[in-house]
Amino acid sequence: MNNIVKVTRLFDLLERLQVNYPKEDILAGKVQGVWRKYSSREYVEISHDYAYGFLEYGLQQQDKVITVMNNRPEWNFVDMGTALAGMVHVPVYSTLSEDDYRYIIPHSDAKIIIIGSALLYKHLAPVIASLKNPPAVFTVDPVEGANNLDQIVTIGRDNKEKWASVIEENKKNITPDTLLTIIYTSGATGTPKGVMHAHSSIVFNFLAHAAQQCKNSSHRYLSFLPLCLIYERTMNYEFQSLGISIYYAENMGTIARDLKDIQADGFCAVPRVIEMMYKKLEDAG
């Protein structure tokens, strides 16, 4: 493709999608059993709304935002919104112990924690409440008594004129060496450790692998490995860089159904997942 938009910072992917891969289903997730698809244009606009909203809420450059959620389009909106605003996304596994969360949240110095579901909120709320300086809490799904992430989107849209020029300046001034994310280990081998990654670290990896990718913008992938896992996260960006549609599985138990439903051209997996699939096929005869 001629005139492909160059990517050196994560948020450059948004311009590439809008210019080179304007499609109607770049991201999709299940909402009440129905696929909710997001176009390239929507992805760009919503990500900017998140950036405006974070700034209007009072966050500043290099402030940390934690997410604890399963794979869904909203993960990407937060991811790109924080990148555009010059903040640091800290995605955390949704399966950690209370002690791990009790360590990671203050250690990361997060100003906001975004929780995906009511079930996760129920698990995390007591932990957060026990902290000396707890971050503000928002949920993606509606949860009684909790702030909803839509509030951030709304104040972002309402204050676009106030913050649009700030974001445009960020696009000029944020360099590939700017801190983008902190990725914590799963804690399986001891206390979770936070690994700091600049834009360049992440971008180099997904562009290098994308050069070997045989699929293109006519294809769609199913995503189910946690996006806080660097492998899945890297592939998530790689697919976006090539305009490949990404559909997020409802949960680990719906993989087979979702693969069939969207007629997926592929997915990323680890040996354990392949072993589970093989056993199911074997048991089915």
PLM features per residue range, with description:
Residues 64, 70-90, 94-98, 106-112, ...:
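A short helix-loop-beta submotif of the ANL/AMP-binding
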